[in-house]
Amino acid sequence: VVAEAVGPPRAPAPRADVVLLLGLPKGPAMDLAVRMATEAGVTHVVPVIARRSVATGDRADRWRRIASAAARQCCRPDDPLIDEPASLTDALGRVTAPERWIALPTDGPPPPPSVEGAAVLIGPEGGFDPAEIALAHAHGFAPVSLGPFVLRAETAAAIGVARLAGR
């Protein structure tokens, strides 16, 4: 009799690239957002310094460790990329995803699961101001609804990523 020790089954890699651009929330909310988005299938996280963000010091290394631990916990075969915080203008200028969504408190449709890759832009506490929304529209981001309720940034991040990742 030959036995082989195996670990838990590995989940498949996300079907499409899903980029999360998240306005930096205050306190530990970004830590939670990174963890939940990783579990939901995000492939790339871009922390965004928005007008209403409470920007903290360089915590990208911490977020990378959190993402790596979350990926291991959910048996993901890979870790998402975690960028250094960037201004909204810089972050939007780097997006190459063919599908681009901005989560707004609207009656619009939910984001469909992505086939080719998508980016979702989530605001910080208090949301984006009108000029930031206009900038996102100018970069090809269409409004999308994540449901009828006002969500915390970290919850919106997880829901947006999960819907785009088809989970």
Predicted region positions:
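RNA substrate-binding interface of SAM-dependent RNA methyltransferases
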Residues: 2-101
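Glycine- and other small-residue-rich loops at beta-strand/loop junctions that grip anionic moieties
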Residues: 22-23, 56, 125, 149, ...
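Short, electropositive, low-hydrophobicity segments enriched in small/polar residues
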Residues: 27, 31, 127-131, 151
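Short, glycine/charged-enriched secondary-structure capping and boundary segments
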Residues: 35, 60-62, 115-117, 134-137, ...
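A short acidic, often aromatic-flanked loop/helix-cap motif at beta-alpha or helix-coil junctions
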Residues: 86-93, 108-110, 150-151
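Structured adenosyl-cofactor binding patch, chiefly the S-adenosyl-L-methionine
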Residues: 130-167
